[in-house]
Amino acid sequence: MTRTGGATDAGGTIGAGGVISTGGATGTGGATATGGSATGGTATGGARIGGATTGGVAATGGTATGGVIRTGGTGAGGVATGGAGAGGATRTGGANTGGVGAGGSVTGGAGVGGAATGGAGAGGSVTGGAATGGSATGGATRTGGTNTGGVATGGAGTGGAGGASTVASGKREMESLDRGVIAINQGGGKVYVGWRMFGLDPGSIGFNVYRATAGAAAVKLNASPITATTDYVDSGADVTKSNAYHVAPVVGGVEQDASAAYTLPANAPAQQYLSVPLRDGGLNYAQANVGDLDGDGQYELVVKWSKSANVDPGSHTTATATVYVDAYKLDGSFLWRVDLGWNLESGSDFTPLLVYDVDGDGKAEVITKTSEGTIDGTGVTIGDTDGDGKTDYRNSDGRVLSGPEFMSIYRGTDGKELIRTNWIARGSVSDWGDSTGNRSCRQQMGIAYLDGAHPSIIMSRGVYAYQVVQAWDYRGGALSKLWAWDNGGKGQSGEWYSSAQCLRMGDANGDGYDEILKGPLALDHTGKTLWDEKLIKGHGDYFHIGILTPARSGLQIFRILEAAQDNGVAMLDAATGTVLWGKTIAGDASRGYASHIDSRQKGAQCWAGQINDDLLNYDGTVICNGTSPSKGDHWAPIWWEGGFTRSITDEFSGNDGVHINQWNGASCSLTELMKTGSGTRITQTIADILGDWREELVIGLPNEIRVYTTTIPATGRLYTLMHNPMYRLNVGQSAQRNFGTSLPDYYLGTGMSTPPAPDIKYVGPPH
């Protein structure tokens, strides 16, 4: 249903730098911690295990009374939240590698009186950080457009701006989640229960599981705290009555506060999905993402959808409906709707969308491309901003090749537009390499921690030839442009420069700052080109970044290209772009994935088009000849099984829905684990949304969105993948073209080691 009426915003007030503010206060759900340090006070109630300490994290030289001390033994390089004595606690997995000077403490990488590697020492020595006579809380100093060892916040221009790359300090801001308890009726009187382990939970943490039936007192189900997994199968439930499940962490033999409960209704059907009914039906094209919109520690679902088909700029068809951005609770409650209007054509290239807490208030914002005619969640319409007397820029073919374009940020709680700025300028359509809009209309967005601590917004326009990337910060209710980059391809039409139909983010070179990755091309956090394969016909649809080759240090990239050439399918070193191995292709490889799917092997297995349907090991050797998952359109991997190998989905559904399949390495074949049934549509998201560390599958039907979750008992446990910075960033790409799937910044698979604690700090209240 299209909104009609409501107030019209005719442009708002233009501030410095062309930023248009549309009013409305930014969410005030919690102050932003700059670096995670508490400047005084003692934690007197005990540190929340896995959450923020509400009484202040170990004041300088102070102690935490009743708190929990988490040093190197409670998870690789755990954070000392109970204070540090002389010499301090040594963080072996974080930014400070030498401990704290006498009586000092390390909070977010700032060493007070000690030596910080990558941080700033107040009166101490600094290696790779910004020392400006005091301590840098949360990373390099970012003030007024100058760059002190980090990212320039005022500079812009071709190639970007900024000083020398250094090692970042300071913990990354991350969502403060609840335990994400889920209960699924498996039939036969069995209920599967799963929950989250947080990124900063101590390695020794255990959990008790409780069930309250029909409102009676909760009963503990396990004999001793569960430490091997974060799931449990309840074989004694009376499913004819309602059952509320919760968990309670156990640390050092002491039970902590209980989680929020998940209630399985009486006579709940034996199905392994949550149903989110669409406010109105007719879904034809959809993509989805998740974020904690209201700061309650639970993910909400943001669905971008249309009754029109998914229009590709290269094979244009006229959109028959506008695109909606709907927000829902996972219990199906509708929250709000943004109608993007007729100037945003129906299709993933036209409507990039992000869901992320970009201002550090503990609540996710929704960020998308908009134009005149867009209606926000409170009914306010963007009006005639340029005074040309029109707000509909469709031509006779239904294409939109002119008119104002914006990036808008919406408040997660109600969809109110908080602020907007101009999108990357279209200029002349032919600047991008054609006259039809195929290239100028291909647009992407992402989130990257360019200073190593705070999320920045990345917007990108153009593939094939001319490409422009910009970086923005949204802090304190204002947008500021950090830098702009372009590849110098303006007006070129024949060449395919290094590019991809998707973006990925990650710390490619290990300096603590994120890079922006475009397949055969990487941009440094400063906005400079980090490396470029400088390929002719260098464009591809998919690529993936992770620890794909465990024997090597650092990250690798598996990428594919669209045109016949040597190394058209290749593994690269993410820090340098060096080709580690490659395969010659005779045409468009179309798709490609790299993930650990064969439990007999170690590292990633790789599959793609144009390589004879072979399955390759991480080093390029063929391990299954002509029978890879690519045969029969089995593509996107998902963590679904009990162990650490990934299963494989049908990315595109057939008549009987989306399948999840287990790969059998010995026979080079697939075994079906689950199928979603007839009428289901294309996969929208694969991410760790609920329960334990394994992933959920989000798919669409004409009238509902379904969130499928595994009920296979786990054989091990990990902290939630959403607390791994690189995984979380790349899940953020899921409501865009060729989202693929995400990988953490550690090796996850057969023969893995316990992953180090992530270098994060929670933003928002504990849950």
Residue ranges and their predicted role:
Residues 171-179, 188-190, 197-202, 216-220, ...:
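Beta-propeller-forming repeat regions
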Residues 1-169:
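Ser/Thr-rich, Pro/Gly/Ala-heavy low-complexity intrinsically disordered linkers and tails
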Residues 207-209:
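Short beta-strand elements bearing conserved aromatic residues within extracellular beta-rich modules
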